[in-house]
């Protein structure tokens, strides 16, 4: 039996309004619990369009057929008009998710975090995280105990800033296994549970065809030597590719693969490490990557 952490990122208004209810229904039918990370502030994701001037981002949008994958409402959100606030407008959906799944903060403003947090000072970052946590806690009526940085935009500054909130764990980086990042003080920080497997948009049209993706991914899961963690997006697997996701769950069950919330992957003893800036094939720009203590 192979146990895989299932992380669901919710980046947009449409992903929350349409994708999450569909995913909740799918997961219920398959008796699966997951960790769902919500963006709760304004939906300004359309402002990423300026990144089309960067060849790597343009190629990603073309090979993943972004217009049909996400829809023009997502691709243009927050461009010619202020982005709609996601959280309170979809409070009932988020509360329903929290009844059955582990719920955490993805971002207050996903676009702002992904585009600008790398240049924020620590207090600006703390204020932004606090705003998101406060909003999500108002919606679900209970403390939020986990978070996942938007776009995996995380480095030492993010690790230090999140210590102020005493969360149970964060999932801010890519890597191989859960660990505790070393703080500037030399003490171990809040546990990190890295994503180990590629996302749909990172590999479609580059490493694998759409129709071959599920078999390709299951092969990666079964060969994973660490602690497998897979991320789906409400805007993708909850919308245009929900049938592909259902097929993945059926095939996974046949292969003895089970999915669980990320917190079930934690153990009392974890290795030490750091979160450093790095790059992942198929994703434009830097993102947080796990570095085991003592390695370079």
UniProtKB/Swiss-Prot annotation:
It catalyses: 4-deoxy-4-formamido-alpha-L-arabinopyranosyl di-trans,octa-cis-undecaprenyl phosphate + H2O = 4-amino-4-deoxy-alpha-L-arabinopyranosyl di-trans,octa-cis-undecaprenyl phosphate + formate. Its EC number is 3.5.1.n3. GO terms for biological process: 4-amino-4-deoxy-alpha-L-arabinopyranosyl undecaprenyl phosphate biosynthetic process; lipid A biosynthetic process; lipopolysaccharide biosynthetic process; response to antibiotic. Pfam families: Polysacc_deac_1. The keyword Hydrolase applies. It is an enzyme of class 3 (hydrolase). Keywords: Antibiotic resistance, Hydrolase, Lipid A biosynthesis, Lipid biosynthesis, Lipid metabolism, Lipopolysaccharide biosynthesis. InterPro entries: ArnD, Glyco_hydro/deAcase_b/a-brl, NODB_dom, Polysacc_deacetylase_ArnD. Residues 2-260 form the NodB homology domain. PROSITE patterns: NODB. Pathway: Glycolipid biosynthesis; 4-amino-4-deoxy-alpha-L-arabinose undecaprenyl phosphate biosynthesis; 4-amino-4-deoxy-alpha-L-arabinose undecaprenyl phosphate from UDP-4-deoxy-4-formamido-beta-L-arabinose and undecaprenyl phosphate: step 2/2; Bacterial outer membrane biogenesis; lipopolysaccharide biosynthesis. One of its GO terms (cellular component) is membrane. GO terms for molecular function: hydrolase activity, acting on carbon-nitrogen (but not peptide) bonds, in linear amides. Belongs to the polysaccharide deacetylase family. ArnD deformylase subfamily. PANTHER family: 4-DEOXY-4-FORMAMIDO-L-ARABINOSE-PHOSPHOUNDECAPRENOL DEFORMYLASE ARND-RELATED, GLYCOSYL TRANSFERASE-RELATED. HAMAP family: ArnD. Catalyzes the deformylation of 4-deoxy-4-formamido-L-arabinose-phosphoundecaprenol to 4-amino-4-deoxy-L-arabinose-phosphoundecaprenol. The modified arabinose is attached to lipid A and is required for resistance to polymyxin and cationic antimicrobial peptides. This is Probable 4-deoxy-4-formamido-L-arabinose-phosphoundecaprenol deformylase ArnD. The lineage of its organism: Bacteria, Pseudomonadati, Pseudomonadota, Gammaproteobacteria, Enterobacterales.
